[in-house]
């Protein structure tokens, strides 16, 4: 029945995304700092690693990570947080990223330019004879390469520092599948899970983040043909509608249909790789 009832599907998806009926920013800060501290200690590893873009998600996750390692050190556990800038050449909103770093106050800051590696991979694909439908498709592929190159860099640092990679995925992005599979979607821990966009903003403000970062227009900024394209432009609906949907509030039929469609077609992005034991298979003898 749930499959065909849009309101029931809304409730089911809200539960899937771990959206609680009640929200208290201070409680969520403590819950997520404790989670990060407990996870790192139990893993036996020493370092958290996170890419900082200058958006509210990485700003929030970064400050939570720094608070977690400071808590661990106060408890005599050796812990360290490395914040990494991962620009593609010159980033247009670099000033925002630097403001985020000043707010986060990470133990260590690194900068790794992904442009040479990302461009080299695109050139290698071109040399292989791979053809694209059009320039837009090539730009999209290049954008995904950038996201995955950032993942490679973060895991390289984590490998060198006995570290764990933090991801910034939250419920509003997750329900829409708005991340690159094995790119920004590749991480070990996701401390923002269970928060929609407005709640991430509320947590960031409770942490003391600058107002300009807390309310910055979100953009993945992966495509060169559409630089700084807002997330909401890609969705076709505003974050407020997605957040209302996740909080089980009334939304327009058009918004609900858009969210349900995105959720369905991006289902594979939220799952581990499928195996013959996960998926029904019909053989020629069936």
Curated annotation (Swiss-Prot):
A GO CC term assigned to this protein in UniProt: cytoplasm
Keyword NAD: yes
Pathway of action: Cofactor biosynthesis; NAD(+) biosynthesis; NAD(+) from deamido-NAD(+) (ammonia route): step 1/1
Binding site for Mg(2+): 57, 173
Binding site for ATP: 51-58, 168, 197, 219
Binding residues annotated for deamido-NAD(+), in chain numbering: 148, 181, 188, 268-269
Domain of life from the UniProt record: Bacteria
InterPro entries with a match to the protein in the record: NAD/GMP_synthase (IPR022310), NAD_synthase (IPR003694), NH(3)-dep_NAD(+)_synth (IPR022926), Rossmann-like_a/b/a_fold (IPR014729)
Catalytic activity, as annotated: deamido-NAD(+) + NH4(+) + ATP = AMP + diphosphate + NAD(+) + H(+)
Keyword terms, alphabetized: ATP-binding, Ligase, Magnesium, Metal-binding, NAD, Nucleotide-binding
E.C. code: 6.3.1.5
GO terms, molecular function: ATP binding; glutaminase activity; metal ion binding; NAD+ synthase (glutamine-hydrolyzing) activity; NAD+ synthase activity
One of the protein's GO biological processes: NAD biosynthetic process
Purpose: Catalyzes the ATP-dependent amidation of deamido-NAD to form NAD. Uses ammonia as a nitrogen source.
PANTHER family xref list: NH 3 /GLUTAMINE-DEPENDENT NAD + SYNTHETASE (PTHR23090), NH(3)-DEPENDENT NAD(+) SYNTHETASE (PTHR23090:SF7)
Family that this chain belongs to: Belongs to the NAD synthetase family.
Subunit annotation: Homodimer.
UniProt name for this protein: NH(3)-dependent NAD(+) synthetase
Lineage: Bacteria, Pseudomonadati, Pseudomonadota, Betaproteobacteria, Burkholderiales
